[in-house]
Amino acid sequence: MTPPTDTSAATPASAGPGDDRVVPTVGPVGAPDLHLMTYNVRRRMPQVLGTRHALADRWSSRLPALRLLIEAERPSVLGIQEALPDQSAQLADALGTDYTAVGTGRDRDRGGERVELHVDTTRLQIVGHEALWLSATPSVPGSRSYGNMIPRTAVHAELDDLATGARLHVVVTHFDHLSARSRRHSAVQLRTFTDALDGPVAVMGDFNAGVGSPAHRELTRGRLVDSREVADERLDPGWGSYSNYGPPRTGGRRLDWLLVDAGAHVDRAGVGGVRPGGVAPSDHDPVHAVVRWPSARAERRPAEHRPEES
Protein backbone atom coordinates (compact mmCIF):
# COMPACT_ATOMS: atom_id res chain seq x y z
CA MET A 1 0.00 0.00 0.00
CA THR A 2 1.36 3.40 -0.97
CA PRO A 3 1.63 5.72 2.05
CA PRO A 4 -0.04 9.14 2.09
CA THR A 5 1.71 11.78 0.09
CA ASP A 6 4.30 13.90 1.86
CA THR A 7 2.87 17.29 0.95
CA SER A 8 6.18 18.98 1.72
CA ALA A 9 7.57 17.37 -1.44
CA ALA A 10 5.75 20.00 -3.48
CA THR A 11 8.22 22.70 -2.39
CA PRO A 12 11.68 21.12 -2.16
CA ALA A 13 14.09 22.85 0.16
CA SER A 14 17.40 24.12 -1.14
CA ALA A 15 20.40 21.99 -0.25
CA GLY A 16 22.35 25.14 0.49
CA PRO A 17 24.80 27.46 -1.27
CA GLY A 18 27.88 25.99 -2.92
CA ASP A 19 26.45 22.47 -3.00
CA ASP A 20 26.90 22.28 -6.77
CA ARG A 21 30.57 21.56 -6.08
CA VAL A 22 29.95 17.95 -5.06
CA VAL A 23 33.04 15.77 -5.35
CA PRO A 24 31.82 12.37 -6.57
CA THR A 25 33.06 9.07 -5.21
CA VAL A 26 33.68 7.91 -8.79
CA GLY A 27 32.02 10.17 -11.36
CA PRO A 28 31.79 9.54 -15.11
CA VAL A 29 34.28 7.07 -16.61
CA GLY A 30 35.50 6.41 -20.13
CA ALA A 31 35.53 3.20 -22.16
CA PRO A 32 36.26 0.41 -21.67
CA ASP A 33 35.37 1.03 -18.01
CA LEU A 34 31.77 1.09 -16.79
CA HIS A 35 30.64 2.81 -13.60
CA LEU A 36 27.98 0.69 -11.89
CA MET A 37 26.11 2.15 -8.92
CA THR A 38 23.36 0.78 -6.69
CA TYR A 39 21.37 2.94 -4.30
CA ASN A 40 18.42 2.41 -1.98
CA VAL A 41 16.99 5.92 -2.20
CA ARG A 42 14.47 5.36 0.64
CA ARG A 43 10.82 5.62 -0.29
CA ARG A 44 8.90 8.76 0.55
CA MET A 45 7.13 8.15 3.84
CA PRO A 46 4.38 9.99 5.71
CA GLN A 47 5.88 12.20 8.39
CA VAL A 48 5.41 11.04 11.98
CA LEU A 49 6.07 13.87 14.41
CA GLY A 50 8.50 13.19 17.20
CA THR A 51 10.26 10.23 15.60
CA ARG A 52 14.02 10.12 15.42
CA HIS A 53 15.37 11.27 12.05
CA ALA A 54 11.92 12.62 11.06
CA LEU A 55 13.41 15.79 9.56
CA ALA A 56 16.30 13.96 7.88
CA ASP A 57 13.84 11.46 6.38
CA ARG A 58 11.68 14.08 4.68
CA TRP A 59 11.83 13.58 0.92
CA SER A 60 11.74 17.34 0.41
CA SER A 61 14.87 17.61 2.60
CA ARG A 62 16.71 14.80 0.81
CA LEU A 63 15.80 15.30 -2.84
CA PRO A 64 18.08 18.30 -3.57
CA ALA A 65 21.08 16.45 -2.10
CA LEU A 66 20.19 13.25 -3.94
CA ARG A 67 19.92 15.12 -7.24
CA LEU A 68 23.32 16.72 -6.70
CA LEU A 69 24.85 13.35 -5.88
CA ILE A 70 23.62 11.46 -8.93
CA GLU A 71 24.30 14.44 -11.21
CA ALA A 72 27.92 14.35 -10.00
CA GLU A 73 28.29 10.56 -10.25
CA ARG A 74 26.57 10.02 -13.63
CA PRO A 75 27.08 6.25 -13.58
CA SER A 76 26.87 4.10 -16.68
CA VAL A 77 24.12 2.12 -14.93
CA LEU A 78 22.29 3.20 -11.78
CA GLY A 79 20.20 0.61 -9.96
CA ILE A 80 17.72 2.06 -7.47
CA GLN A 81 15.48 0.50 -4.85
CA GLU A 82 12.42 1.71 -2.92
CA ALA A 83 11.44 4.50 -5.33
CA LEU A 84 7.78 5.39 -5.66
CA PRO A 85 6.71 6.51 -9.17
CA ASP A 86 7.01 10.23 -8.42
CA GLN A 87 10.46 9.72 -6.90
CA SER A 88 11.55 7.75 -9.94
CA ALA A 89 10.43 10.57 -12.22
CA GLN A 90 12.39 13.12 -10.18
CA LEU A 91 15.55 11.02 -10.33
CA ALA A 92 15.13 10.53 -14.08
CA ASP A 93 14.82 14.29 -14.44
CA ALA A 94 18.09 14.77 -12.54
CA LEU A 95 19.92 12.34 -14.84
CA GLY A 96 18.55 13.93 -18.00
CA THR A 97 17.58 12.71 -21.44
CA ASP A 98 20.74 10.65 -22.02
CA TYR A 99 19.36 8.08 -19.56
CA THR A 100 16.50 5.61 -19.97
CA ALA A 101 14.86 3.82 -17.03
CA VAL A 102 13.48 0.28 -17.04
CA GLY A 103 11.56 -1.23 -14.16
CA THR A 104 8.14 -1.77 -12.67
CA GLY A 105 6.26 -1.57 -9.40
CA ARG A 106 6.18 -4.63 -7.17
CA ASP A 107 2.42 -4.77 -6.61
CA ARG A 108 -0.14 -6.83 -8.51
CA ASP A 109 -1.09 -3.82 -10.63
CA ARG A 110 2.63 -3.06 -11.18
CA GLY A 111 2.30 0.05 -9.05
CA GLY A 112 3.89 0.96 -5.76
CA GLU A 113 7.51 0.71 -4.72
CA ARG A 114 9.92 -0.12 -7.55
CA VAL A 115 13.37 -1.31 -8.41
CA GLU A 116 14.77 0.21 -11.58
CA LEU A 117 17.80 0.46 -13.82
CA HIS A 118 18.70 3.89 -15.20
CA VAL A 119 20.97 3.34 -18.21
CA ASP A 120 23.27 5.85 -19.92
CA THR A 121 22.20 5.33 -23.53
CA THR A 122 25.17 7.25 -24.92
CA ARG A 123 27.24 4.24 -23.86
CA LEU A 124 24.82 1.32 -23.55
CA GLN A 125 21.95 0.27 -25.78
CA ILE A 126 19.03 -1.51 -24.12
CA VAL A 127 18.39 -4.70 -26.10
CA GLY A 128 15.66 -6.06 -23.83
CA HIS A 129 14.41 -6.03 -20.26
CA GLU A 130 12.05 -7.92 -17.97
CA ALA A 131 10.69 -7.88 -14.43
CA LEU A 132 10.85 -10.95 -12.20
CA TRP A 133 8.93 -11.48 -8.99
CA LEU A 134 10.97 -13.31 -6.38
CA SER A 135 8.57 -16.20 -6.00
CA ALA A 136 7.74 -19.62 -7.41
CA THR A 137 5.81 -17.81 -10.17
CA PRO A 138 8.22 -15.05 -11.25
CA SER A 139 6.09 -13.88 -14.18
CA VAL A 140 3.00 -13.26 -12.01
CA PRO A 141 2.86 -9.64 -10.79
CA GLY A 142 2.57 -9.30 -7.03
CA SER A 143 3.31 -12.99 -6.37
CA ARG A 144 4.84 -14.16 -3.07
CA SER A 145 6.02 -17.66 -2.13
CA TYR A 146 8.96 -17.49 0.27
CA GLY A 147 7.51 -16.08 3.48
CA ASN A 148 7.79 -12.37 2.69
CA MET A 149 4.71 -10.31 3.53
CA ILE A 150 5.17 -7.93 0.61
CA PRO A 151 6.14 -8.74 -2.99
CA ARG A 152 9.81 -8.58 -3.90
CA THR A 153 11.12 -8.10 -7.42
CA ALA A 154 14.14 -7.98 -9.67
CA VAL A 155 14.63 -6.23 -13.01
CA HIS A 156 16.93 -7.64 -15.68
CA ALA A 157 18.23 -5.67 -18.66
CA GLU A 158 20.29 -6.93 -21.58
CA LEU A 159 22.65 -4.21 -22.79
CA ASP A 160 25.00 -3.71 -25.72
CA ASP A 161 28.16 -1.73 -24.94
CA LEU A 162 28.45 0.70 -27.84
CA ALA A 163 32.15 1.26 -27.14
CA THR A 164 33.39 -2.32 -26.87
CA GLY A 165 30.75 -4.39 -28.63
CA ALA A 166 30.21 -6.54 -25.53
CA ARG A 167 26.72 -7.64 -24.56
CA LEU A 168 26.07 -7.71 -20.83
CA HIS A 169 23.29 -8.44 -18.39
CA VAL A 170 22.49 -6.27 -15.38
CA VAL A 171 20.04 -7.21 -12.61
CA VAL A 172 18.79 -4.98 -9.80
CA THR A 173 16.82 -6.31 -6.83
CA HIS A 174 15.62 -5.64 -3.28
CA PHE A 175 15.38 -8.60 -0.90
CA ASP A 176 12.98 -8.82 2.02
CA HIS A 177 13.87 -7.01 5.24
CA LEU A 178 12.18 -9.44 7.65
CA SER A 179 12.33 -13.01 6.37
CA ALA A 180 15.69 -14.78 6.21
CA ARG A 181 13.92 -17.65 4.47
CA SER A 182 12.71 -15.29 1.77
CA ARG A 183 16.20 -13.87 1.28
CA ARG A 184 17.70 -17.34 0.98
CA HIS A 185 15.12 -18.54 -1.55
CA SER A 186 15.39 -15.27 -3.48
CA ALA A 187 19.15 -15.75 -3.68
CA VAL A 188 18.71 -19.29 -5.04
CA GLN A 189 16.26 -17.99 -7.64
CA LEU A 190 18.58 -15.20 -8.78
CA ARG A 191 21.67 -17.42 -8.82
CA THR A 192 19.84 -19.95 -10.99
CA PHE A 193 18.64 -17.15 -13.26
CA THR A 194 22.05 -15.51 -13.68
CA ASP A 195 23.91 -18.81 -14.09
CA ALA A 196 21.80 -19.40 -17.21
CA LEU A 197 22.67 -16.05 -18.82
CA ASP A 198 25.19 -15.96 -21.64
CA GLY A 199 27.82 -13.25 -21.30
CA PRO A 200 28.95 -10.78 -18.64
CA VAL A 201 26.64 -10.31 -15.64
CA ALA A 202 26.26 -7.78 -12.82
CA VAL A 203 23.76 -8.11 -9.95
CA MET A 204 23.17 -5.16 -7.65
CA GLY A 205 20.76 -4.08 -4.96
CA ASP A 206 19.76 -3.92 -1.33
CA PHE A 207 19.88 -7.48 -0.05
CA ASN A 208 19.00 -6.66 3.58
CA ALA A 209 21.73 -9.07 4.70
CA GLY A 210 25.40 -8.73 5.40
CA VAL A 211 28.43 -10.19 3.68
CA GLY A 212 28.79 -13.82 4.74
CA SER A 213 25.05 -14.26 5.23
CA PRO A 214 23.31 -17.28 3.66
CA ALA A 215 21.99 -15.05 0.86
CA HIS A 216 25.45 -13.66 0.10
CA ARG A 217 27.02 -17.13 0.19
CA GLU A 218 24.35 -18.51 -2.12
CA LEU A 219 24.73 -15.78 -4.72
CA THR A 220 28.52 -15.98 -4.73
CA ARG A 221 28.80 -19.77 -4.96
CA GLY A 222 28.05 -19.68 -8.69
CA ARG A 223 29.57 -17.37 -11.28
CA LEU A 224 29.34 -14.16 -9.23
CA VAL A 225 31.88 -12.47 -6.96
CA ASP A 226 31.52 -9.46 -4.66
CA SER A 227 33.09 -6.50 -6.48
CA ARG A 228 34.40 -4.93 -3.28
CA GLU A 229 36.18 -8.14 -2.32
CA VAL A 230 38.07 -8.46 -5.63
CA ALA A 231 38.68 -4.79 -6.52
CA ASP A 232 42.18 -3.48 -7.15
CA GLU A 233 41.24 -0.50 -4.96
CA ARG A 234 38.61 -0.22 -2.23
CA LEU A 235 36.79 3.09 -2.12
CA ASP A 236 35.97 2.98 1.60
CA PRO A 237 37.83 2.07 4.81
CA GLY A 238 35.37 -0.66 5.77
CA TRP A 239 32.09 1.25 5.91
CA GLY A 240 28.72 -0.42 6.13
CA SER A 241 26.09 0.71 3.65
CA TYR A 242 23.29 1.52 6.13
CA SER A 243 24.18 4.69 8.01
CA ASN A 244 20.60 5.74 8.92
CA TYR A 245 21.20 9.43 8.10
CA GLY A 246 24.37 9.59 10.16
CA PRO A 247 27.95 9.71 8.90
CA PRO A 248 29.39 6.60 7.21
CA ARG A 249 30.27 4.01 9.84
CA THR A 250 33.28 1.72 9.87
CA GLY A 251 32.34 -1.81 10.80
CA GLY A 252 28.66 -1.47 9.93
CA ARG A 253 26.88 -4.14 7.93
CA ARG A 254 27.15 -3.89 4.18
CA LEU A 255 23.55 -4.64 3.17
CA ASP A 256 23.97 -3.36 -0.38
CA TRP A 257 26.16 -5.32 -2.78
CA LEU A 258 27.38 -5.10 -6.33
CA LEU A 259 28.24 -8.54 -7.69
CA VAL A 260 29.88 -9.29 -11.03
CA ASP A 261 30.90 -12.43 -12.87
CA ALA A 262 34.41 -13.66 -12.27
CA GLY A 263 35.49 -12.66 -15.77
CA ALA A 264 35.18 -8.96 -14.96
CA HIS A 265 38.11 -6.80 -13.95
CA VAL A 266 37.12 -4.54 -11.03
CA ASP A 267 39.33 -1.48 -10.91
CA ARG A 268 37.77 0.00 -7.78
CA ALA A 269 34.67 -0.59 -5.69
CA GLY A 270 33.11 0.30 -2.37
CA VAL A 271 30.61 2.36 -0.41
CA GLY A 272 30.25 6.07 -1.16
CA GLY A 273 29.94 8.49 1.74
CA VAL A 274 29.18 11.79 -0.05
CA ARG A 275 26.94 14.20 1.89
CA PRO A 276 26.03 17.14 -0.39
CA GLY A 277 25.70 20.21 1.81
CA GLY A 278 26.04 17.97 4.86
CA VAL A 279 22.78 16.19 3.98
CA ALA A 280 22.49 12.40 3.80
CA PRO A 281 20.38 11.75 0.67
CA SER A 282 19.10 8.42 2.05
CA ASP A 283 19.34 6.15 5.08
CA HIS A 284 21.53 3.89 2.91
CA ASP A 285 24.75 4.84 1.16
CA PRO A 286 25.40 3.96 -2.48
CA VAL A 287 27.76 1.23 -3.59
CA HIS A 288 29.96 1.78 -6.65
CA ALA A 289 32.14 -0.38 -8.88
CA VAL A 290 34.29 0.53 -11.88
CA VAL A 291 34.30 -2.59 -14.01
CA ARG A 292 35.46 -3.67 -17.43
CA TRP A 293 34.82 -6.83 -19.36
CA PRO A 294 36.79 -8.17 -22.32
CA SER A 295 35.90 -6.34 -25.51
CA ALA A 296 33.88 -8.37 -27.96
CA ARG A 297 35.91 -6.79 -30.74
CA ALA A 298 39.21 -7.70 -29.09
CA GLU A 299 38.06 -11.28 -28.71
CA ARG A 300 37.41 -11.70 -32.43
CA ARG A 301 40.23 -13.52 -34.17
CA PRO A 302 40.76 -13.94 -37.90
CA ALA A 303 40.07 -17.42 -39.15
CA GLU A 304 43.16 -19.56 -39.24
CA HIS A 305 44.39 -20.12 -42.80
CA ARG A 306 44.80 -23.75 -43.62
CA PRO A 307 46.36 -24.76 -46.97
CA GLU A 308 44.13 -26.96 -49.06
CA GLU A 309 45.06 -30.59 -49.05
CA SER A 310 46.14 -31.96 -52.40
PLM regions: where:
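Metal-dependent phosphoester-hydrolase catalytic domains
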Residues: 3-6, 10-26, 123, 181, ...
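Soluble or luminal CAZymes and related metallo-dependent hydrolases
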Residues: 58-66, 83, 148-152, 181-189, ...
